[in-house]
């Protein structure tokens, strides 16, 4: 394809440019959960996205998670009947880049905030 670079960093930048707020929030909340040593799962994510007015269906939350998993930005593990979300090294790099660009505004996870109290 003309005009397409084979440079891996160009691919990473292109992938980041296509991520939306919902992807950013999954990366953010997964990282926050890991920092607090709390398992953050798809059900928590769905509740947080619903609370934030981003989605009304669990199917959308699962699709968001699956897209990030395919890009190797998160891992999803079945643990005790839950699908827990873990940020990868690539995901941490993506999150850092998204935060520094200021494209998205940080929003609190209701689940993680509840645990803080």
Q: Which residue ranges define each predicted feature?
A:
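Short intrinsically disordered terminal tails
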Residues: 1-2, 116-117
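Short, amphipathic alpha-helical interaction segments positioned at domain boundaries
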Residues: 90-116
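Short alpha-helical segments that sit at the start of domains
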Residues: 2-37
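Minor-groove-contacting beta-hairpin "wing" of winged helix-turn-helix DNA-binding domains
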Residues: 81-88
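Non-catalytic, well-ordered alpha-helical scaffold segments
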Residues: 21-24, 62, 88-89
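A short, conserved structural fragment
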Residues: 69-79
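Short amphipathic alpha-helical interaction segments
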Residues: 54-71
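Short acidic, hydrophobic short linear motifs in intrinsically disordered regions
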Residues: 36-49
């Amino acid at each position: 394809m003309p005009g397409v670079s084979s440079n891996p960093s160009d691919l990473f930048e292109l992938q980041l440019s296509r991520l939306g707020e919902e992807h950013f929030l999954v990366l953010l909340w997964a990282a926050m959960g890991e920092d607090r040593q709390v398992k953050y799962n798809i059900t928590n994510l769905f509740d947080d996205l619903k609370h934030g007015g981003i989605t009304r269906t669990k199917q959308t939350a699962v699709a968001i998670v699956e897209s990030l998993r395919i890009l190797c930005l998160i891992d999803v593990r079945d643990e005790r009947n839950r699908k827990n979300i873990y940020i990868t090294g690539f995901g941490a790099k993506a999150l850092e880049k998204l935060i520094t660009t200021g494209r998205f505004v940080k929003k609190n996870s209701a689940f993680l905030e509840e645990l803080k109290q």
